[in-house]
């Protein structure tokens, strides 16, 4: 934030915010052989720390969500299995409205912001996938192995999780996208693909980037709070390497357009639902963890890296009080995830790595330089995320 955090005001803001989101006031419990989110009426925890507390433990009052602060930072920690970036952004819009209104003694415009006292609609509450039996059957596609960043760079012994944060002017990057038939997510995916290709020009394995997609549009459930994230596969084909950037951008946008058609997204939903049913059909937690491990290893084999862009944050009038914004997540597979956020006139690209080497960040920055894109490498941090105590790990 622009100024030091007032802990009393933050407490008031969190209380009002969580009143608006009862479906996030829960704890994860084991009931028989199943797991459920049970109501949790304990206060949501706020700590004076940058590292927060372990979620779903006594320290977090057994919540799957918590807040912390230090100096001028406010941090929201939330279980990704409960919601995704879209859902977390809604919580932050509400929190920032309440916090900034009281902290700066102003009346902010509340249009489009969810507030305490609102009626929570069924569309916001109910899982849009749980009872769907009309989803299209996904084809059984076998994908070849993708170029593996860790193996290619010889980083098997580098286990220091690290985040590199890069900022770019929003207006300048959007102009660059317009000139090259791109959009933020596709262009970052393309520039990353180009950077990796130049590092490994003789690789026989394809460079395949997963671009995250919001499934709410295809499900016609824009208000749903659940974690509804699918993926689009962007493969940097050999024949594309000699194309000009604009033609490459058009090709990537074409891949996005085709895979983002409603039926294709719904097939992805069906595939994820099928995996969930398969996991839950196992009789023991050990068997379920075995299936999860297999799925994660499969994803790690067919994906080179992941790029995620929730969309412009649009924190409304509260953005004037925001100095910096970061979006950090943990990756299911070992490797690289790039989280893109757009707040207060700039894009921030967080390179979230399960290793510390700057080889891929440096290659990406060289790609920015070669294309005349001005950037600021803000900082490099150890990637530390709160632990989540899950019942099946006991």
Protein language model features and the residues they cover:
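Conserved catalytic core of two-metal-ion nucleotidyltransferases
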Residues: 35-39, 115-116
């Amino acid at each position: 934030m622009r100024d030091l955090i007032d802990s009393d005001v933050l407490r008031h803001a969190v209380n009002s915010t969580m009143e608006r989101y009862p479906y996030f006031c829960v704890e994860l419990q084991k009931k028989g052989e199943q797991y459920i989110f049970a109501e949790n009426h304990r206060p949501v925890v706020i700590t004076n720390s940058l590292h927060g507390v372990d979620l779903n433990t006594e320290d977090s009052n057994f919540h799957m969500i918590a807040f912390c602060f230090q100096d001028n930072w406010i941090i929201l920690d939330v279980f990704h299995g409960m919601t995704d970036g879209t859902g977390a952004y809604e919580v932050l819009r509400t929190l920032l409205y309440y916090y900034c209104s009281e902290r700066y003694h102003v009346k902010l415009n509340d249009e489009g912001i969810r507030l305490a006292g609102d009626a929570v609609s069924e569309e916001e509450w109910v899982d849009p996938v749980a009872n769907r039996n009309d989803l299209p059957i996904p084809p059984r596609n076998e994908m070849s192995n993708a170029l593996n960043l860790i193996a290619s760079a010889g980083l098997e012994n580098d286990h220091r999780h690290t985040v590199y944060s890069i900022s770019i002017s929003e207006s300048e990057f959007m102009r660059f996208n317009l000139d090259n038939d791109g959009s933020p997510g596709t262009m970052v995916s393309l520039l990353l693909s180009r950077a990796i290709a130049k590092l490994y020009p003789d690789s026989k394995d394809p460079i395949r980037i997963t671009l995250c997609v919001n499934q709410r549009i295809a499900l016609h459930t824009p208000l749903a709070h659940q974690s509804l994230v699918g993926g689009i596969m962007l493969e940097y084909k050999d024949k594309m390497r000699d194309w000009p950037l604009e033609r490459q951008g058009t090709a990537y946008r074409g891949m996005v357009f085709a895979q983002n058609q409603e039926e294709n997204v719904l097939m992805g939903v069906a595939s994820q639902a099928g995996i969930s049913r398969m996991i839950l059909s196992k009789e023991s937690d050990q068997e379920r963890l075995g299936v999860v491990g297999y799925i994660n290893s499969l994803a790690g084999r067919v994906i080179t890296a992941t790029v995620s862009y929730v969309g412009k944050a649009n924190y409304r009038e509260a953005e004037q009080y925001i100095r910096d914004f970061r979006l950090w997540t943990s990756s299911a597979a070992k490797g690289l995830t790039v989280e893109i956020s757009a707040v207060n006139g700039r894009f921030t690209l967080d390179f979230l790595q399960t290793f510390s080497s700057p080889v891929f960040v440096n290659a990406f920055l060289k790609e920015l330089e070669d294309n005349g894109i001005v950037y600021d490498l803000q900082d490099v941090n150890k990637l530390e995320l709160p632990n989540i105590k899950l019942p099946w790990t006991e």
